[in-house]
Amino acid sequence: NITLYTYAELESLDGFIGNLKARIRRKSKGIDEKLCTGCGLCTTKCPVKKIPGEFDERMGNRSAIYVPFPQAVPNKPVIDRKNCTYYIKGKCRICEKVCPTQAIRFDQEDQITETEVGAIVVATGFTVKQTDFFPEYGYGKYPDVITGLQFERLASASGPTFGEIRR
């Protein structure tokens, strides 16, 4: 059996292959995944919409409650506590008001899970090479000099320009 922990970090790992004890921090998403249907109403009604999206290499915007990337598993939103008006000022809660299943959980905290496992697959993603190491290409100086990853996001049908290359 495979258990998938998304939006989580491995805190510690003890034991040996085949007999491991894992301590996993499951970061708060601010939603109840069992109640959320992934309808997207909360993301469309959120008034905070000008946050540069990490997945689109900051070339497109997202709201304070958002699905981290297309085809996310599970395809459900997370609340960005650093940009959410409720967490900053104690006001708003529009996402909570419009949610048809009452899945928003502003009081949700990180959870620590300890489990015994035989093996672990860690999918950490990647780190993009910093462009300031190559000043001769003019990245940051000329607006039309972009990284390969930025070009990939622009060319993608799910990207900030819906696949239309325009600069």
Predicted segment positions?
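Non-heme iron-sulfur electron-transfer modules
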Residues: N1, Y5-L35, P47-I146
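Short, charged, solvent-exposed linker or helix-capping segments at domain edges/interfaces
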Residues: E33-G38, A157
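Rossmann-like NAD(P)H-binding beta-loop-alpha module
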Residues: T37-G40, G163-R167
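Short, glycine/charged-enriched hinge/interface segments at domain edges or termini
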Residues: C84, A157-E164
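A nucleotide-sugar donor-handling region in carbohydrate enzymes
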Residues: K141-S158
